[in-house]
Amino acid sequence: MSLQGKVALVTGASRGIGQAIALELGRLGAVVIGTATSASGAEKIAETLKANGVEGAGLVLDVSSDESVAATLEHIQQHLGQPLIVVNNAGITRDNLLVRMKDDEWFDVVNTNLNSLYRLSKAVLRGMTKARWGRIINIGSVVGAMGNAGQTNYAAAKAGLEGFTRALAREVGSRAITVNAVAPGFIDTDMTRELPEAQREALLGQIPLGRLGQAEEIAKVVGFLASDGAAYVTGATVPVNGGMYMS
């Protein structure tokens, strides 16, 4: 599996799953652009890529802004080339029970986690169509399929992500562009490490494999979907959740 010569764009790449994806695509030979919402985050991405021998850059991108998406893509195209692999990973949470949820908690999550797919995917399709090759990979969540109390906004956005993935896959398949999603379960991150022991044990009790996933395990699936080995896979949502949810 080689991505040599391909330019890959990974949003939300300063830590966790996004960082692991950026490093995996770089390991496979891609030139990687990772984005963050702040200059310090973009600098961290650039340093991480360099430290791991990956060619690429860290850039500031607000996926909720049409202007930011347009400016960032123009910069990438001018300096690094057309991104033919795009990983929509950036996302936020604003958890609350629906009865208490404020409008901005709903709309911020939907705008960042779902509307951003529309903005970024639409913006890169022309270049992929011209190249007659492309990979769009959307990072969803097990919550999009099974739901989670206090996360109606997040669950709705992630469920929408899966529908978007399937519909777009049907639109662009004839151009050798594949569109897939990866739906992680609970992953070992700073947030899950801070859970109280009792809560952590209860969580592990729901997972047949009896452990949290690693960000690198998500990244390996993304690396496969980005490769020519997955050229006949499109419109799929790949669950990586340790068996927590089976469909």
From Swiss-Prot:
Disulfide bonds: none
Catalytic residues (UniProt): Y154
Keyword NADP appears in the UniProt entry: yes
Matches recorded under PROSITE patterns: ADH_SHORT
EC numbers, comma separated: 1.1.1.100
EC main group: oxidoreductase
GO molecular function list: 3-oxoacyl-[acyl-carrier-protein] reductase (NADPH) activity; NAD binding; NADP binding; oxidoreductase activity, acting on the CH-OH group of donors, NAD or NADP as acceptor
Membrane spanning residue stretches: none
Chain residues that bind NADP(+): G12, A13, S14, R15, T37, D62, V63, N89, Y154, A155, A156, A157, K158, I187
GO aspect biological process, one term: fatty acid elongation
PANTHER family in the record: 3-OXOACYL-(ACYL-CARRIER-PROTEIN) REDUCTASE (PTHR42879), 3-OXOACYL-[ACYL-CARRIER-PROTEIN] REDUCTASE FABG (PTHR42879:SF2)
Purpose of the protein: Catalyzes the NADPH-dependent reduction of beta-ketoacyl-ACP substrates to beta-hydroxyacyl-ACP products, the first reductive step in the elongation cycle of fatty acid biosynthesis.
Name of the protein this chain belongs to: 3-oxoacyl-[acyl-carrier-protein] reductase FabG
Organism encoding this protein: Pseudomonas aeruginosa (strain ATCC 15692 / DSM 22644 / CIP 104116 / JCM 14847 / LMG 12228 / 1C / PRS 101 / PAO1)
